[in-house]
């Protein structure tokens, strides 16, 4: 480490202060650039690394945040903020034992810190649960019962929320197998009228459906998801009057989802929607978004589709708020049903044999094919490696080849990887989500890959647009320097106002900065 000149120290301090301004304005990517410039000028200052770690954390670059915290602590072992940020980065990477060590250091210096205390309790809970899973070995999976497919609706009949319910009504059919055992539920009268009343008379007024209704909706939707392959195939080449709209992360931003449908049109026989994962967590209306999507799936099974994202998983839901939101609004049992229904979601969608849509990105195996995706056994929690995990977690990078992920899970894949996969599988483009893009939709890797992100002003802080990709064969709108595909239309939308409830308002995990 070379000793910086006095002039470089002064310039570095200026860049750090500029980065701090961007952080206050919640422009975290710009802040990262300024902190990096400061570090390039003077790499002896612990605070520059811990500040950049904060900005990396805010854009989900958890591995990069952790690496910066390591350097900050090496330079200054008394940098308490760096310990806190490293602990939270470890939690995001599901490394709870490592996080607990840093939290204990923090609490030794600040015994009454409420956020650290809450985070430590969360770590302890995860560690206990992991010990329990290891203690029972494989018995858990062997004994796992599908709550959705064995649902007994009458078990909800005594609940007070049902007796007091005055909202729109649903009719249910209790299903049985050939041995007369409970086999889930079916909604007999799902309608646009019910969905509209559910949204306007309940959700927009801060009210909830009875738990019996929610359980039946989840069970019915789960049955539909289970009937779909791990890679769904959609086609509108032969029906050019049918639009397919591909949307990215929505993260519980219910009011923005409603605005999306208002702006781009409702689901119907002439308009198919595909939401590309991460529709829960972060935002504080994740239950409302999930129930709206599940109702739309029941009403329009051939025109509404969901891919699974990395946040449709148990560990993410425990950390980022969906489990706690479910428990607050409904019950642990309802969350468990949602969690099992997430295991039924497809992992990818192929449109017109041209466009492959997955939440994260391409697998690291160079021989991977579409047939491999079809054959993935998806009915489980995502593993820590392999194509299943990579479809949910991988990110693109500008450099060729494979690289480490800034998130710490998955990997980064270069334009050569994308080009080879497209050629080998005779595809035009990859559509993926998983990362915020300020413009809502971004063409990357020489136009071979597109990232679509549909949560405008993400977490009430980023100021980004939301985006949508419409697949309209032969009727696209070309845009110089942007859209080069005659089959696509790119549109964006801004965030709308919502009640003053902060992101992750129901979370008890102590996960935040």
From Swiss-Prot:
Which cofactors does this protein require? Mg(2+); Mn(2+)
- Check the record and name the SMART domains matching this protein: PP2Ac, TPR
Q: What is catalysed by this protein?
A: O-phospho-L-seryl-[protein] + H2O = L-seryl-[protein] + phosphate; O-phospho-L-threonyl-[protein] + H2O = L-threonyl-[protein] + phosphate
Report the cofactor remark: Binds 2 Mg(2+) or Mn(2+) cations per subunit.
* Gene3D superfamilies named in the record: 3.60.21.10, Tetratricopeptide repeat domain
Query: Which molecular function GO terms apply here?
Result: metal ion binding; protein serine/threonine phosphatase activity
Q: Calcium: present as a keyword of the record? A: no
The UniProt note on how this protein's activity is regulated states: Stimulated by arachidonic acid and other unsaturated fatty acids, and by arachidoyl coenzyme A.
Q: Which domain of life is it from?
A: Eukaryota
- What keywords appear on the UniProt entry? Hydrolase, Manganese, Metal-binding, Nucleus, Protein phosphatase, Repeat, TPR repeat
Induction record: Expression peaks in early log phase and decreases dramatically during the stationary phase (at protein level).
Q: Matching Pfam families, A to Z?
A: Metallophos (PF00149), PPP5 (PF08321)
Q: Positions of the region Catalytic? A: 188-513
Do you know which InterPro entries this protein is assigned to?
Calcineurin-like_PHP_ApaH (IPR004843), Metallo-depent_PP-like (IPR029052), PP5_C (IPR041753), PPP_dom (IPR013235), PPP_phosphatase (IPR051134), Ser/Thr-sp_prot-phosphatase (IPR006186), TPR-like_helical_dom_sf (IPR011990), TPR_rpt (IPR019734)
Coiled coil ranges: none
Q: How does activity depend on pH?
A: Optimum pH is 7.8.
Subcellular localization(s) per the UniProt record: Nucleus
Q: Positions of the TPR repeats?
A: 12-45, 46-79, 80-113
Tell me which residues this entry annotates as catalytic: 311
Q: Which residues bind Mn(2+) 1?
A: 249, 251, 278
On subunit structure and binding partners, the annotation says:
Interacts (via TPR repeats) with HSP82 (via C-terminal MEEVD pentapeptide).
- In UniProt terms, what function does this protein have? Protein phosphatase that specifically binds to and dephosphorylates the molecular chaperone Hsp90 (HSC82 and HSP82). Dephosphorylation positively regulates the Hsp90 chaperone machinery.
Misc. comment = Present with 6990 molecules/cell in log phase SD medium.
| The protein's name in its UniProt record | Serine/threonine-protein phosphatase T
Q: Which organism is it from?
A: Saccharomyces cerevisiae (strain ATCC 204508 / S288c) (Baker's yeast)
């Amino acid at each position: 480490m070379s000793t910086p000149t006095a002039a470089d120290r002064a310039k570095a301090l200026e860049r750090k202060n500029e980065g701090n301004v961007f952080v206050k304005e919640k422009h975290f990517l710009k802040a990262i650039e300024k902190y990096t410039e400061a570090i390039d000028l003077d790499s002896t200052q612990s605070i520059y690394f811990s500040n950049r770690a904060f900005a990396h954390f805010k854009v989900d670059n958890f591995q990069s945040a952790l690496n910066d915290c390591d350097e900050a602590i090496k330079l200054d072992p008394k940098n308490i903020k760096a310990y806190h940020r490293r602990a939270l980065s470890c939690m995001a990477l599901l490394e709870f034992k490592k996080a607990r060590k840093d939290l204990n250091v923090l609490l030794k210096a600040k015994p009454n810190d409420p956020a650290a205390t809450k985070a430590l309790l969360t770590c302890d809970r995860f560690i206990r649960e992991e010990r329990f899973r290891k203690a029972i070995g494989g018995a858990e999976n062997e004994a796992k019962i599908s709550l959705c497919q064995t649902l007994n609706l009458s078990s909800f009949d005594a609940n007070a929320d049902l007796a007091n319910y005055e909202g729109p009504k649903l009719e249910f059919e209790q299903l049985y197998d050939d041995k007369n055992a409970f086999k889930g539920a079916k909604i007999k009268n799902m309608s646009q009228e019910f969905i509209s009343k559910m949204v306007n008379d309940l959700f927009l007024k801060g009210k909830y459906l009875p738990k019996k209704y929610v359980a039946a909706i989840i069970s019915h939707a789960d049955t539909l998801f289970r009937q779909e392959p791990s890679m769904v195939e959609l086609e509108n080449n032969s029906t050019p009057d049918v639009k397919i709209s591909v949307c990215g992360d929505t993260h519980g931003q219910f009011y923005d989802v409603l605005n999306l449908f208002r702006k781009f049109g409702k689901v119907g026989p002439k308009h198919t929607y595909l939401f590309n994962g991460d529709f829960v967590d972060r935002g504080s209306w994740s239950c409302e978004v999930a129930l709206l999507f599940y109702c739309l799936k029941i009403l329009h099974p051939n025109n509404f589709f969901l891919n699974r994202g990395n946040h449709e998983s148990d560990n993410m839901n425990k950390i980022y708020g969906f489990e706690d939101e479910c428990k607050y609004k409904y019950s642990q049992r309802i969350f468990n049903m949602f969690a099992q229904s997430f295991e039924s979601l497809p992992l990818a969608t192929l449109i017109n044999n041209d466009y492959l849509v997955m939440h994260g990105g391409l697998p690291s195996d160079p021989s991977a094919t579409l047939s491999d995706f079809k054959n993935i056994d998806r009915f489980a929690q995502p593993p820590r490696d392999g194509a299943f995990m990579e479809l949910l977690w991988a990110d693109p990078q500008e450099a060729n080849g494979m690289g480490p992920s800034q998130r710490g899970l998955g990997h980064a894949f270069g334009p050569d990887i994308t080009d080879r996969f497209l050629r080998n599988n005779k595809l035009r483009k990859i559509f993926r989500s998983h990362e915020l893009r300020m413009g809502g939709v971004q063409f990357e890797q020489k136009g071979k890959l597109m990232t679509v992100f549909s949560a405008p002003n993400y977490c009430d802080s980023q100021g980004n647009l939301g985006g949508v990709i419409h697949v309209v064969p032969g009727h696209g709108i070309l845009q110089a320097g942007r859209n080069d595909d005659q089959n696509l239309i790119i549109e964006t939308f801004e965030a709308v106002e919502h009640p003053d409830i902060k992101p992750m308002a129901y979370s008890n995990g102590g996960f935040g900065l």
